Amino acid sequence: MHIPPSALATTVVAALLASPAQAQTAAPASTANTLDTVIVTGTRVSDRTVAESQSPIDIISAESLQATGTPELATALARALPSLNFPRPALSDGTSAIRPAQLRGLSPDQVLVLVNGKRRHTSSLLNLNGTIGRGAAAVDLNTIPVAAIARVEVLRDGASAQYGSDAIAGVVNIVLKGAEKGGSLQAGFGQYSAGDGNNYELSGDTGVAYGNERGWLHAAAQLNQQDPTDRARGYAGAPSVSQPAVGQKAFKIGDPDVNAQAASLTTEYQFSDAVTGYAFATASNRDITSFAFFRAPGSSQNILSVYPQGFLPEIQSYAKDRSLVAGVRGSTAGGWDWDASYNYGYNRIDFHTRNTLNVSLGPTSSMSFYDGALETTQNIVNLDVKRGFDWGLAYPVTVAFGAEYRNEKWNQSPGEVGSYFQAGTLAGGAQGFGGFAPSVSGQYSRDSYALYADIEADFTDKFSAGLAGRYEDYSDFGSQASGKASARYAFTDKIALRGTVASGFRAPSLAQQYFQSTSTTFLAGNPNPFEIRTFPADSNVARAFGAEPLDAETSLSYSLGLVLQPTDALYLTVDAYQIDVDDRIVLSSNLTGTGVRTLLESQGIFGINGGRYFTNAVDTRTRGVDVVGSYRWQLAASSVDLTAGYNYSETEVRRVAANPAALSANGLSLERIDRTERGRIEEGFPRDKFLVNGSWNSEHWTLALGATRYGKYSTRPAAAINDQTFGAKWVVDASASYKVDRWTLTLGADNLLDEYPDENNFANSTSGQFPYSNLSPFGFNGAYVYGRINYRW
């Protein structure tokens, strides 16, 4: 792995200030408090702290999350964690609002998300457009109200042996507020410097005890209205009937309009000294309006008598998310601790297209359609058992084992007939977002069974180690085993070495196996629309293009870290890692051309320009380093906190499976994985990210200043001459909070200096209309100014 000198220099700076991930405008907790936090992620030992962990782990407090200018959990995490990337793509259908996050440059579905240590269900949305996470169906982090969260634990290490499928890059464990009494109420407003994107927020939480203090209940809710932003520009290409008029601003490019509500409820009740019942639930609704590509007056996708000036379709998505976990835990007279639980998760997205038409229906076509729905359901039953044994070592040895049954369902429901109807060679379906036809819809399910065991011991006061193993059997593709070994050695109280070796896997999601639909795609450098259909890998059409049945991804990861605490006020960790992923599941390139169209028509599919499918065609290697730490300077009547973090990560495609013979036969000359897709995997995210923050805290005031440097990233269009690298950018955030009695007033600015990413080259800008790349890690909205008032009791 080659780390450029600039990255090394940045690492040195990070080492002087570095921090265990506090949010950018936060007033962080003291170093001692952070290090002494007992963790519940990555270990089954009951009293393991951050400082003692054998794996790198970050703790982001509730105060840190709420101190940023955003009501979105994923955005707040991205500002706190140098290894997390959460871009803001536009014109990408549902992905514009249900955005995926990636850890250490890997795919968003290679991160496992837990809530209170229980697996969170994924979104039903499959990301199909040219964004980070193309082909992934990830967890929607923004369905959980920030007001409900006590802290977030982020394990930056492979953990499939402990938690099962998906935990290749790491684990995000969201710990909800519990027995805390009292509560808070918060209202906020923000706006971008361009005068758009108004954001209205109202949130609160409260906790009470009941049953003579044997039980407690904590409730939280959040309401948010986000107005859209628009950074599109006028058409600057050659005059054409199939394009907007020269100078016409026909598109809307930016954040969608979102109306969101989220709530949570957590409770526990102690039935006896040995048995406690618990439950927690979350619910979220979102009404999302985004925009598709403009249809010009003379386009084959328009009827001139209906829209003489052309039209801009609107995609309206209604997202509903529900979860419930209920369980009982306790201990036996023999010293065994046990936990039995049921876990239900549900996500549904209904799609509508408005301000549109279906050309195949002629001038009498409706202008709005119901396009169908995607739906996912998760049901899990599990049992965890553990006990500490006194085997004559420095501390008891923790032995744990358990079993889990998981049932997953994924449904694709059809839309109304007009949303998908297609006649002859005419453009079919609702323009902007074509509906799901009954022929591509269906209901699918699978079962899996898992057994796990692990052992963790402190052999001496200085040396601890652990072993974990897990076996899972899936009804659709077979079984998979994974293992993990970890260790930590403390040379002194101030310096320790830690490391892990882990194998892992990720099962292909049901959406990746069965989703199929047609979408309109505009390829870089080509102003004409392409109707591209996604086919299941085991369909006749996909097999004609050389597809094979999907199998699980497998991974092998290594990490080696140094933990330093030279003083009580300074804490520093440096962790290097390598993650090899074999048979990585990716969405193939868009296979287009006359030969493709001929092949599709031979299969009875008309009006389609091309196809694509999921494939295990790629092996990747990701290498990098994380540096995090913190320093607190205690003054007479105040304190100064300095925090920082740095991540350098590079991904290399080590192998691309041989191109199927079918893509070179019958006059075809196509690549299953082309340079655009390979470039997105290797260079579509910042090579490095550095954040540094400072805050001054007194009895009444908190003043915070933070800066994040996002490294360079690149895009590779079909023509190499149009390759573009986007330069590194600094984004500065600042806030001031005044506290009096129970009230806190905050004024702040994210992206204070109104920084924008480098602009697209003209060839990549759709004739000047798309000034910025969807890959930008901090979006392209400019400065955001906000105010917030909070009352606590």
Model-derived segments and spans:
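C-terminal beta-signal and adjacent terminal beta-strands/loops
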Residues: S123, E650-T651, G706-R716, S737-W793
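Outer-membrane beta-barrel transmembrane domain signature of Gram-negative proteins
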Residues: S305, F311-L324, A333, Y344, ...
